[in-house]
């Protein structure tokens, strides 16, 4: 091969128990010259003939890495190869040869091959050729049959060791170059072992750590967690000064809030509460000693409530749920019939209980106001309507017995006596207590009035208009309480005119004639004002009820017409289907008749042909006259 500077140096051994190649050749020649009658005793040998050879008896394995692997990582010049091989062989004085060709490994041979090239690079085929030409062991193993094993080993070592570097060849269709990596570390690349091979070392290291921990415990090293121990803290049992932990370099101590992932409270979402912790500090500046703080019974109960889950904290008061008609699971109005309305005295007793259940330190309840249904005028569909205010103020202070109709389908009306508190005497001194009592009673009166209006209107009007399952004939406004309602005609007209003709107001002439003197009587006395307003409101409500009933009748008629049309269409479709079926039957019958006729004609013609052939006599032809 032209690319090498010189031939591979001869392998000489200086050991006593290993012969060189030349000596081995001389010995073989001498043995060949011996006469045949010289007898040698048969030598016993081991069963296995594989390499490496078994070690001799006094063999001691060196503790450190071989010098050959350390020296072979560098680029070797041609002149220094002899000294390197001698030093490598000198390191193995007490051991047998590692391989069949000597103590050099495949990596060492590849290193010598690449280093002996002029441009310090070889392809894979050139490395094979160098092995066959320069190593005596591979001279007779260059053919394809016997070279598969050692060529595979060479490829394996090229990819395994970090001392070899693969460079892409510039030419197309050519194999890559293999070069020596000058930046590679000495020795083999670190290979990761399985955990099962290092169990003894791991157990030793773990035992040492346990001994150190016990020594620290006995020495009395106390961490920060010993003062205020927590059940979920991962810094357990005085391990704050563990010397070999990467977290403790420099001797720092872990915080007591440091927690392990498995024992942290982030994994238990059910125990977390979005409510802020109870503030036990007073309003002044200095902090409170929590160890000496004595909690009151109310505060301890509050803390016990806050320690529960979110579902336990968001429970609503059962009395309020029954009163408002909400379900505790979903917060939506429930469909079963409501219970009877409680008396005002029961409501007075329930209201302070609800306030106590929703306040911690006497403050106003936060979420109770949002659950109260807002009053809405069912005629004008607005919250701020004068009809509601006039209806609230126009109720008589005496006890009124009315028929209550709950706003739920298929429920019976319940009659309760609503006692309004009209005998309230407020002192002129303006005492705060009397003002609070007055406000509470006014709120209770408003709630009772809202229940009156809402139950009557929702039970009779809204149930019919919004529920499609109920028939339209159940709409009835005869029991509508119009005696105590007052209405502003100007506001009503403006409200109706703002709908741009969507709603009609039909005021009869008699009602207009009665409204004219009533307007004059408004300026004279308050009694005439209330009566005229009552009459006006009654006329408007009657007119609106008439228009609503007319619209409902129209809707009912339209629905009936649509139903009749659908029935007619269904009947027509059924008739068409019947006609099509009859036509198909007729066609099938005609086809069958035609087929039967064809078959009959065919059989008849066949019979006639057979008869004709059978009845014809045999014709004997006579010879012509000229034949004698």
UniProtKB/Swiss-Prot annotation:
Record's compositionally biased regions (Low complexity):
344-359, 438-451
Q: Does the keyword Protease apply?
A: no
* Compositional bias ranges of the Pro residues kind: 334-343
* Record PROSITE patterns: FORK_HEAD_2, FORK_HEAD_3
The main place the protein resides is cytoplasm
Q: Kindly list the positions at which Phosphothreonine occurs in this protein.
A: 50
Matching CDD domains, A to Z?
FH_FOXO
Q: Which domain of life is it from?
A: Eukaryota
Subcellular localization is given as:
Cytoplasm; Nucleus
Recite the UniProt keywords alphabetically.
Answer: Activator, Cell cycle, Cytoplasm, Developmental protein, Differentiation, DNA-binding, Growth regulation, Nucleus, Phosphoprotein, Transcription, Transcription regulation
The cellular component terms of Gene Ontology attached to this UniProt record, alphabetical and capped at eight, are: cytoplasm; nucleus
DNA-binding annotation, residue ranges on this chain: 101-207
Chain intervals for the UniProt region annotation (Disordered): 188-210, 223-270, 327-373, 398-451
* InterPro entries linked: Fork_head_dom, TF_fork_head_CS_2, WH-like_DNA-bd_sf, WH_DNA-bd_sf
Q: What's a single GO MF annotation on this record?
A: DNA-binding transcription factor activity, RNA polymerase II-specific
Q: Residue positions of the PTM Phosphoserine? A: 81, 196, 264, 267-268, 273
According to its UniProt entry, one GO biological process term is: regulation of DNA-templated transcription
List compositional bias (Polar residues) regions by residue number.
Answer: 227-236, 261-270, 411-423
What does the protein in this record do?
A: Transcription factor involved in the regulation of the insulin signaling pathway. Consistently activates both the downstream target Thor\d4EBP and the feedback control target InR. Involved in negative regulation of the cell cycle, modulating cell growth and proliferation. In response to cellular stresses, such as nutrient deprivation or increased levels of reactive oxygen species, foxo is activated and inhibits growth through the action of target genes such as Thor.
Q: How does it assemble?
A: Interacts with melt.
Give the protein's recorded name.
Forkhead box protein O
Source species, please?
Drosophila willistoni
Gene behind this chain?
foxo
């Amino acid at each position: 091969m032209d690319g090498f500077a010189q031939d591979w140096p001869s392998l000489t051994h200086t050991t006593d128990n290993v012969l060189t190649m030349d000596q081995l050749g001389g010995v073989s020649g001498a043995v060949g010259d011996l006469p045949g009658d010289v007898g040698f005793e048969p030598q016993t040998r081991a069963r296995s003939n594989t390499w490496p050879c078994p070690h001799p008896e006094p063999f001691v394995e060196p503790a450190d890495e071989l010098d050959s692997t350390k020296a072979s990582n560098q680029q070797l010049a041609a002149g220094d190869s002899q000294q390197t091989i001698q030093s490598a062989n000198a390191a193995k004085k007490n051991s047998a040869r590692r391989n069949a060709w000597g103590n050099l490994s495949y990596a060492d041979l590849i290193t010598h091959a690449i280093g002996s090239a002029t441009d310090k690079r070889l392809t894979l085929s050139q490395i094979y050729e160098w092995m066959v030409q320069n190593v005596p062991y591979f001279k007779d193993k260059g053919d394809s049959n016997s070279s598969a094993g050692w060529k595979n080993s060479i490829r394996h070592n090229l990819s395994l060791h970090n001392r070899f570097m693969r460079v892409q060849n510039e030419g197309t269709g050519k194999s890559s170059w293999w070069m020596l990596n000058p930046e590679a570390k000495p020795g083999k690349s670190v290979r990761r072992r399985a955990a099962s091979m290092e169990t003894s070392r791991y157990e030793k290291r773990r035992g040492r750590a346990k001994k150190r921990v016990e020594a620290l415990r006995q020495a009395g090293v106390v961490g920060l967690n010993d003062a205020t121990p927590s059940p979920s803290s991962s810094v357990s049992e005085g391990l704050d000064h563990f010397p070999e932990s990467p977290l403790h370099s420099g001797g720092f101590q872990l915080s007591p809030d440091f927690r392990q992932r498995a024992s942290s409270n982030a994994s238990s979402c059910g125990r977390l509460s979005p409510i802020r912790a109870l503030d036990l500090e007073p309003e002044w500046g200095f902090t409170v000693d929590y160890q000496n703080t004595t909690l009151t019974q109310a505060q301890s109960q509050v803390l016990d409530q806050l320690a529960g889950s979110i579902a336990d904290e968001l429970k609503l008061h059962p009395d309020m749920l029954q009163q408002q008609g909400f379900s505790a699971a979903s917060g939506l109005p429930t469909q079963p019939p409501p219970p009877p309305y409680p008396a005002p005295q029961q409501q007075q007793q329930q209201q302070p209980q609800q306030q106590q259940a929703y306040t911690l330190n006497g403050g106003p309840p936060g979420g109770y106001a949002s659950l109260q249904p807002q009053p809405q005028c069912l005629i004008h569909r607005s919250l701020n309507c004068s009809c509601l205010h006039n209806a609230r103020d126009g109720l008589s202070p005496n006890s009124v017995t009315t028929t209550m109709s709950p706003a739920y389908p298929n429920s019976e009306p319940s009659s309760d006596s609503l006692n309004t508190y009209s005998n309230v005497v407020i002192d002129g001194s303006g005492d705060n207590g009397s003002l609070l009592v007055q406000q509470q009673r006014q709120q209770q009166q408003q709630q009772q009035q809202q229940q009156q209006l809402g139950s009557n209107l929702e039970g009779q009007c809204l149930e019919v208009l919004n529920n499609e399952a109920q028939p339209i004939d159940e709409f009835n406004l005869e029991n509508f309480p119009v005696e105590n309602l007052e209405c502003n005609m100007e506001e009503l007209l403006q409200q109706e005119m703002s709908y741009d003709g969507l709603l009609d107001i039909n005021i009869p002439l008699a009602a207009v004639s009665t409204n004219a003197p009533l307007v004059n009587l408004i300026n004279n006395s308050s009694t005439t004002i209330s009566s005229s307003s009552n009459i006006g409101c009654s006329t408007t409500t009657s007119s609106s009820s008439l228009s609503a009933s007319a619209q409902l009748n129209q809707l009912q008629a339209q629905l009936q017409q649509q139903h009749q049309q659908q029935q007619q269409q269904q009947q027509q479709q059924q008739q068409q289907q019947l006609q099509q079926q009859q036509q198909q039957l007729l066609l099938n019958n005609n086809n069958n008749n035609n087929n039967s006729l064809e078959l009959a004609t065919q059989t008849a013609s066949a019979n006639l042909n057979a008869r004709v052939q059978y009845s014809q006599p045999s014709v004997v032809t006579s010879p012509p006259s000229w034949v004698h």
